[in-house]
Amino acid sequence: LQPMAIALASIADGTSMITENVFEARFRFVEEMVRLGADARTDGHHAVVRGIPQLSSAPVWSSDIRAGAGLVLAGLVADGETEVHDVFHIDRGYPLFVENLRSLGAEIERVA
């Protein structure tokens, strides 16, 4: 759940450190969070994230299920419209993801 935690940490007060000891490439998605304006960097098995008041919209690319979900959540709080590409990854793990977010009040649209 690191991508979701990093998305949250990117707009939270203070600095957060998230550690990943299993999957080496888990933090690849941090580069996409930086495209959204996140103040984040990786250092080996750690991601360090300093919270900022607001993310900005940008086109981003999902590399796996959890990264895609984290990018969508970050995009929902970003200023403007964010396009998340390669969302087929999300479909494998989160059926009805868009519909569930809409039922919670999210303004989200899936474009074919």
UniProtKB/Swiss-Prot annotation:
It comes from the Bacteria. GO terms for cellular component: cytoplasm. It catalyses: phosphoenolpyruvate + UDP-N-acetyl-alpha-D-glucosamine = UDP-N-acetyl-3-O-(1-carboxyvinyl)-alpha-D-glucosamine + phosphate. UDP-N-acetyl-alpha-D-glucosamine binds at residue 22. Its EC number is 2.5.1.7. GO terms for biological process: cell division; cell wall organization; peptidoglycan biosynthetic process; regulation of cell shape. Its main location: cytoplasm. Keywords: Cell cycle, Cell division, Cell shape, Cell wall biogenesis/degradation, Cytoplasm, Peptidoglycan synthesis, Transferase. It holds the Pfam family EPSP_synthase. Belongs to the EPSP synthase family. MurA subfamily. This is UDP-N-acetylglucosamine 1-carboxyvinyltransferase. It comes from Mycolicibacterium phlei. The gene is murA.
